[in-house]
Amino acid sequence: MARNKRPEETANLILSVAFRLFMEKGYEHTSIQDIINQLGGLSKGAIYHHFKSKEDILEAVSDRMTAESNQMLAKIRDRSDLTGREKLKTIFKASINRPVQADIFTVAPDFHNNPKLLFSLLHDTIENAAPNYILPIMKQGIADGSIETDYPEQLAELVLLAANVWMNPMIFDSSEEESYRKFMVFGQMLRGFGLDILDGEMLERLKELASIYQKRK
């Protein structure tokens, strides 16, 4: 076990330094050499031993954030004091207000030039978040009468794809005004399923994140 500790520490150091630089300079404006310069004498070979490219480093940073998000989703999913609809509203509010969201929009990765990152987001949405966290809540909502749908699996995917992809200013390069319009359409769609779960506070936060991205890109 001791022999594996140092490589793990090195990888964690690389990720921590890279994330800080992504925050300070933005992903697109941070080079591998910038990361090396902040690693206290580690060589380029040390980085490439753990990560094949800057894109791989970004994916690893994103994986860290996904793990934290999954913990939050599981905690809300497993609560016994909320209806299905209340859980969905709690998830949306908690997700958009997480401090790490501002970090992500500050890093501002270019999804158009990083198709692997976009695929990773889509894959996690469809294969992980929708079936493991949102679908159980949909089924609970149907059972307790707070959600109206005959297609819980598809609705779980649709809701997350709209929230994580279609409304994501980093993917569609949306301005604050465009984000507002998408938010309103998303709210109308949700209300059609009896899900009046969006509010003005969430809208203002989305506009704030869009503004952070537009300033950083």
PLM regions and their residue ranges:
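Short secondary-structure transition hinges
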Residues: 100-146
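Hydrophobic alpha-helical bundle segments that form small-molecule/ligand-binding pockets
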Residues: 73, 129-159, 163, 170-174
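Helix-turn-helix
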Residues: 21-56, 60
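Hydrophobic alpha-helical connector segments
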Residues: 60, 74-105, 156-159
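C-terminal peripheral helix-coil segments that are non-catalytic and often amphipathic
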Residues: 139, 143-144, 172-217
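Generic hydrophobic, amphipathic alpha-helix propensity
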Residues: 10-18, 35, 61-65, 69
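Hydrophobic/aromatic residues within well-ordered alpha-helical segments
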Residues: 54, 61, 65, 69, ...
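A short secondary-structure junction motif
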Residues: 42, 68, 98-106, 141, ...
